[in-house]
Amino acid sequence: MKMRYVLLGLVLMAPLWVMAEEQEGAPGRTIEDLFLSQDIELQILRSQALGTDPEMKRLALRSIRAMVEQGVTSDGVFVVLEALASEGVSRQVRSQGAIVNNFPLIRREATELLGQVGGERAKNTLLRVLRDDPEVVVLAEAAYALGSIGLNQNNEVSDYLVHTLLRENARSTPDNNLAYSIVISLERLSEANGGLANPEVINALIETASSPYIRTVRMRAVDAIVNMRDHGR
């Protein structure tokens, strides 16, 4: 898995949580709706994703990764990815009161694949992940994936990322990987959109550069500030 932790070595203020509408024309199907599908491969993916065995979920993700790499995806495949990205968070399975499908590494991989699929719907799903997921490993992947997609209409994505970064900066022991992923994504969004209009982006990066992160993160924030000043010129 291409997780960004290797880059480091060890390596949400305002009411931002009103989600954007689903992509115009996108069917609002759920993974349960796929039971009606006549596509055998899709039925297999659904069964693997809905089970409580993490190995079956990994098999589903392996198949989806192969499809994504071949450029072959469908609405049904996307629905499966959405479900896996919220596995154990918004979609919970309980046994005797305990959640039995809380698999952060499954959510992380599904989140990574959503970034590769791209588009408005993937962006919206990733914003929900960034809002709801309690695991920093998943949040870091979601932040990185949002930068890879590059969409930032009305500063929606950059506002989410800045909110998350400022929250992390305020912690006594902030997570280096999450901050590093957000810094990279803000820079990518700036480059893809000819700069970022929200002045809070630079302020958040300046704060990051002086927060208790490892030197790699602090210097990356400084580099991002320098590079982003050129994007709007």
Predicted features along the sequence, with ranges:
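Boundary at the C-terminal end of the N-terminal hydrophobic targeting segment
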Residues: 18-22
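Short coil/turn segments at helix-helix junctions and helix-capping linkers
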Residues: 133-134, 211-215
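Amphipathic alpha-helical scaffolding segments comprising HEAT/armadillo-like alpha-solenoid repeats
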Residues: 28-48, 70-96, 119-131, 151-168, ...
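Bacterial N-terminal signal peptides
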Residues: 8-15
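Long, acidic/serine-threonine-rich intrinsically disordered regions with weak helical/coil propensity
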Residues: 41-61
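Bacterial N-terminal signal peptides that target proteins for export
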Residues: 1-7
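Structural detector for internal amphipathic alpha-helices that build alpha-solenoid repeat scaffolds
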Residues: 25-35, 55-72, 96-100, 104-119, ...
